[in-house]
Amino acid sequence: MLGTLRAMEGEDVEDDQLLQKLRASRRRFQRRMQRLIEKYNQPFEDTPVVQMATLTYETPQGLRIWGGRLIKERNEGEIQDSSMKPADRTDGSVQAAAWGPELPSHRTVLGADSKSGEVDATSDQEESVAWALAPAVPQSPLKNELRRKYLTQVDILLQGAEYFECAGNRAGRDVRVTPLPSLASPAVPAPGYCSRISRKSPGDPAKPASSPREWDPLHPSSTDMALVPRNDSLSLQETSSSSFLSSQPFEDDDICNVTISDLYAGMLHSMSRLLSTKPSSIISTKTFIMQNWNSRRRHRYKSRMNKTYCKGARRSQRSSKENFIPCSEPVKGTGALRDCKNVLDVSCRKTGLKLEKAFLEVNRPQIHKLDPSWKERKVTPSKYSSLIYFDSSATYNLDEENRFRTLKWLISPVKIVSRPTIRQGHGENRQREIEIRFDQLHREYCLSPRNQPRRMCLPDSWAMNMYRGGPASPGGLQGLETRRLSLPSSKAKAKSLSEAFENLGKRSLEAGRCLPKSDSSSSLPKTNPTHSATRPQQTSDLHVQGNSSGIFRKSVSPSKTLSVPDKEVPGHGRNRYDEIKEEFDKLHQKYCLKSPGQMTVPLCIGVSTDKASMEVRYQTEGFLGKLNPDPHFQGFQKLPSSPLGCRKSLLGSTAIEAPSSTCVARAITRDGTRDHQFPAKRPRLSEPQGSGRQGNSLGASDGVDNTVRPGDQGSSSQPNSEERGENTSYRMEEKSDFMLEKLETKSV
């Protein structure tokens, strides 16, 4: 028990020390605020002198409330007395601050403490200054009436939302509340005025506080007794919410005196409203609103606009018509801060919503001028001041939204044009249309004869291959395959190409077979010098004339001979082919008639017959497989062939190079065997062939023994053999070129 009592005594001592410190701090605050009032309660330049206590100033018409109407002066003497009291206060305020605490107490204690029931004498001493400075006001019904009319509210920002609702419903009605004692000391009012404690309970719903309109003496709310807290809690809310009710010997329509504590709450509320709506002060430029109101922010808040509402906006808008807050000098054509409808409530924290509100309010006159249908939709209803929230559901009115956006676009100087959105699937259809159009133009360009340059590579350019997803290299086989498969009739063309190559092989064999029959005297040791002398010239002539029509095919490797020739008009291409064929036939007949006995078949010397036939067969299969990548040729084994594959020495002379097609034709003509790809008849053994004699006269061991027998004249037959080999290669090359051109022209 003793320990408990000592603990309780220690706690009481600590509480007493804390209370003493708080009271001392409160007294210092009161003295400093009083000095500030005295310092700034004087005119600056030519501005009217406004009494901080009453918010009134003198005009030629009479005493006027700041931002309000003219006060009715029933008793002119009392008004003059009230105007003289601030001047008297200037002289005696410093003295009051000095000897105020020493004055005796003239005030009766309001009540007993709720806990101990003891009388708090300290509160009487702290309020002695107010009673000493207060004038002698007789106890009359006027005092109670003024108290009922002009009871003020302090620190509305710290109150809950229920106080606003109750304050709006009890305007003009009397609410009687039984006062409760408190240890909290009140603030000292301005010197020369009477004061009473006016406190409100922050947590009791049965004792609501008055609304902001009760600051206005023109809209009083009457209570018989002042409110004091029920407990001894000394929180910031209770300390800052202490206020006073000062009385003046005015009549009912006059105004009472107000202290700095009452003005502080109103000024704080006004400044908070101004700071929360800063864009409204620079909205005239219309640049700040457009920089912050972008599409990204609008869409982010739009999805929640049907659920998010500005807290307290309805109450502040409703009370703003009746409540006025001192803000600036009243000017004709300019209302007080309470009339500014382009400001938001302090509790609205969404920047995008603030900008939307300010934009709608400021530009409302322009919107009325631009679109008469704007009247159909009220932006800010008269009863509610909440913002217009757009619903993002499927039932949203698109016409109304489009009209609103059009108006915003017309009003704002910065035009923000939204990009047209492409629906899903529309882009794919558009891409398909572009691709079809591109293919059509490409075909038309290829069919046009004047727009066809001679191409030395594949029919499709590298750009076309890149467009179709093929390789970037112009000569790549993958691009050829891609282009070939992309054609509509690729299979039919592949089949026709296969048949054409078979026909080409047959004609090559037939052309090779007719040569030995005309070369019966090719192995004779004696030759005609006239023919020997004229043969080089004829060979060069044939070379030049043949190259005029087949130089394009000679310049391309065998792996690229599949390239489609220039696509021309069918009739023009057919006539050109017939002319070349007739010219070639004439030259061939003329050459055969001039030298009927000197035509010999150049052989691949130094290779055995069986080995040469096998090599020729595999080279032919590989070459044809490369030329026509058709499944018909995929079953055969392919060996890499080279244009220099038949590089052999002819009768001990220097080697010559011939294309693979020439070597194939010569080898098959010499050997006489027919391959399954070239169904040619085997020549008779009785026919004069150069193979038997050459087999006896020349060594067959890999071209090492190239000695000529004593009875042969190698010196004269060797150049003739070279010339005949060149003639045969050129002739077969021309045949192959013309057949390919004919085939490709048909395929086109």
UniProtKB/Swiss-Prot annotation:
Residue stretches of biased makeup (Basic and acidic residues): 565-574, 721-748
Official protein name in the record: Holliday junction recognition protein
Task performed by this protein: Centromeric protein that plays a central role in the incorporation and maintenance of histone H3-like variant CENPA at centromeres. Acts as a specific chaperone for CENPA and is required for the incorporation of newly synthesized CENPA molecules into nucleosomes at replicated centromeres. Prevents CENPA-H4 tetramerization and prevents premature DNA binding by the CENPA-H4 tetramer. Directly binds Holliday junctions.
Keyword Protein biosynthesis: no
Segments of skewed composition (Polar residues): 524-562, 688-699
Organism of this sequence: Homo sapiens (Human)
Any GO BP annotation: regulation of DNA binding
Gene Ontology cellular-component terms listed: chromosome, centromeric region; cytosol; kinetochore; nucleolus; nucleoplasm
Assembly notes: Interacts with CENPA (via CATD domain); the interaction is direct and specific for CENPA since it does not interact with H3.1- or H3.3-containing nucleosomes. Heterotrimer composed of HJURP, CENPA and histone H4, where HJURP interacts with the dimer formed by CENPA and histone H4 and prevents tetramerization of CENPA and H4. Identified in a centromere complex containing histones H2A, H2B and H4, and at least CENPA, CENPB, CENPC, CENPT, CENPN, HJURP, SUPT16H, SSRP1 and RSF1. Interacts with 14-3-3 family members in a phosphorylation-dependent manner. Interacts with MSH5 and NBN.
Top-rank taxon: Eukaryota
Keywords: Cell cycle, Centromere, Chaperone, Chromosome, DNA-binding, Isopeptide bond, Nucleus, Phosphoprotein, Ubl conjugation
